[in-house]
């Protein structure tokens, strides 16, 4: 890695650590949202650096849908134990009672009930006034215009027309009772930055990011990995083995794999250098309707 690139990554690292420390000092009850993906792994690594040699001064929160990949659950539990992190797991009990299923109810309803409502329930339950998230501006257009300190009203809603200025790395965290801030320390990182930093810092990631033969079924132009026996095969669908990996991770029935031979981090970085598509193309929830991500964020989504 050349010196300019290394300096760029260290500048991003310093900015993110500064933001994380600012939140810890400014807010009374912060939490780090931990979705188990590559961005969460980088964000957790930065947080551990920010407070080393001490422990994290806030817990991790995983909003569980019951439909994550099995390897994600294993990685989550191993990581929390290895780093001595307090891990809070919340699953929407109302959604569980309703039997919400992405195959039956679709991506929009599943995401709204199990993710958006589940997140709001957890934030209310524990009274968190700030929540770190791993979103980046290069991922999607609504995230591109969101501030690092993203103000949310008492219903956890985001108003893109009512955002606060952030000049010269000054962040306004003033809130009234019931309001909160979503904080995005990785806002200025790109997908390539993330992968190069993971390689540089030797950060552990879920093995699903690396290519290997996996059972998949093609549906709506996406390759869905068959992770357990809850798969709902449609007429004419056949499970086949393909060499695939994931650029983004979510609920397995709603996350598409990509055909790839990249079995190592350097190989992934090579792919990123020539990629012309967003990693979010593998998320079915982004295809619900035009502007679906912004609509979800207005309703309280991550």
UniProtKB/Swiss-Prot annotation:
Keywords: ATP-binding, Nucleotide-binding, Nucleotidyltransferase, Transferase. GO terms for molecular function: ATP binding; sulfate adenylyltransferase (ATP) activity. InterPro entries: PAPS_reduct_dom (IPR002500), Rossmann-like_a/b/a_fold (IPR014729), SO4_adenylTrfase_ssu (IPR011784), Sulfate_adenylyltrnsfr_sub2 (IPR050128). The keyword Nucleotidyltransferase applies. CDD domains: Sulfate_adenylyltransferase_2 (cd23946). Pathway: Sulfur metabolism; hydrogen sulfide biosynthesis; sulfite from sulfate: step 1/3. Disulfide bonds: none annotated. Pfam families: PAPS_reduct. It catalyses: sulfate + ATP + H(+) = adenosine 5'-phosphosulfate + diphosphate. Its EC number is 2.7.7.4. SUPFAM superfamilies: Adenine nucleotide alpha hydrolases-like (SSF52402). One of its GO terms (biological process) is sulfate assimilation. The keyword Protein transport does not apply. Heterodimer composed of CysD, the smaller subunit, and CysN. With CysN forms the ATP sulfurylase (ATPS) that catalyzes the adenylation of sulfate producing adenosine 5'-phosphosulfate (APS) and diphosphate, the first enzymatic step in sulfur assimilation pathway. APS synthesis involves the formation of a high-energy phosphoric-sulfuric acid anhydride bond driven by GTP hydrolysis by CysN coupled to ATP hydrolysis by CysD. Belongs to the PAPS reductase family. CysD subfamily. This is Sulfate adenylyltransferase subunit 2.
């Amino acid at each position: 890695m050349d010196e300019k690139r290394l300096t760029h990554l260290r500048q991003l690292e310093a900015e993110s650590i500064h933001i994380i420390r600012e939140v810890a000092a400014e807010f009374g009850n912060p939490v780090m949202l931990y979705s188990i993906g590559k961005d969460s792994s980088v964000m957790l690594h930065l947080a551990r650096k920010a407070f080393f040699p001490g422990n994290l001064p806030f817990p991790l929160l995983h909003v569980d849908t019951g439909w994550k990949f099995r390897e994600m659950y294993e990685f989550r539990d191993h990581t929390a134990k290895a780093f001595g992190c307090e891990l809070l797991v919340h699953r929407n009990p109302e959604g569980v009672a309703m039997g919400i299923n992405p195959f039956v109810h679709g991506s929009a309803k599943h995401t709204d009930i199990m993710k958006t409502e589940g997140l709001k329930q957890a934030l209310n339950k524990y009274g968190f006034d700030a929540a770190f998230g791993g979103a980046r501006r290069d991922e999607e257009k609504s995230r591109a215009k969101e501030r690092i300190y993203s103000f949310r009203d008492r219903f956890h809603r985001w108003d893109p027309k009512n955002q606060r200025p952030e000049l010269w790395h000054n962040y306004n965290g003033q809130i009234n009772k019931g309001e909160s801030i979503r904080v995005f320390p990785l806002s200025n990182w790109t997908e390539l930055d993330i992968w190069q930093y993971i390689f540089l810092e030797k950060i552990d990631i879920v093995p699903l990011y690396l290519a290997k033969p996996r059972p998949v079924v093609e549906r709506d132009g996406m390759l869905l990995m068959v992770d357990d026996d809850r798969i709902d095969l449609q007429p004419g669908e056949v499970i086949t083995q393909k060499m695939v990996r994931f650029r983004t991770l979510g609920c397995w029935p709603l996350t598409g794999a990509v055909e790839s031979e990249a079995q190592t981090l350097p190989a992934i970085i090579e792919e990123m250098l020539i990629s012309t598509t967003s990693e979010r193309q593998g998320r079915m929830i982004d295809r619900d309707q035009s502007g679906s991500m912004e609509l979800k964020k207005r309703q309280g989504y991550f």
